[in-house]
Amino acid sequence: MYTELKSYQQIIALLKEYGIRHCVLSAGSRNVPFVHSVEKDHFFKCYSVVDERSAGYFALGLSQELNEPVVISCTSSTATCNYWPAVAEAFYKGLPLIILTSDRDPAMLGQWEDQMIDQVGMYARHVKKSVNLPIINDAEDEYYCERLINEALLELDHHGKGPVHVNVPMRSYNSTFNVKRLPKVKRINRVDVQSDERIWADYAEQLCTSKKILVVCGQG
């Protein structure tokens, strides 16, 4: 059973589409919806590391050993700052980390709310991509959220590997876990000269069955 929070539903669904299964979790109040959901999904391999600084370095070693992307997830506010050293090292070592930071409603920023700092773009030049997801209220928000997650995941190995940051605001973190199926999501594939034969074969099949074909050549 999954969280009712749609942004986290989309994240989990797209992680599965991209085949990203290793998650290093530092559980806190605002990332419980993600933590509980992936722990109950047998697709994911979860590692519990309470201290965020230690979790970041554990994920670095895991990514380096497995040669795969690794997710790190924490609660909001200063907990996110503890990832900084590992994020910087991942950037300069070219290691693909997905940094998931839970956040509060942006309307509450600067209003003396507890556990809230400005987390948007907080890792600055030390990530390849940083996105701030919308709080989903309608179909347009769902589309935008899905697009941003895809953009972040595509950058993990675009022109070299490295970390990406996905910030996840929410109005309430008191999520129930009654959702049986994840939403259908669209994985966006980047095709270039280094793509494997399977991806090229899929696109060749699509072209052969299309009524109108336009091929545009240029530099990526």
Give the ranges of each region predicted by the language model:
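N-terminal alpha/beta PP-like core and its mobile active-site loop of ThDP/TPP-dependent enzymes
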Residues: 1-220
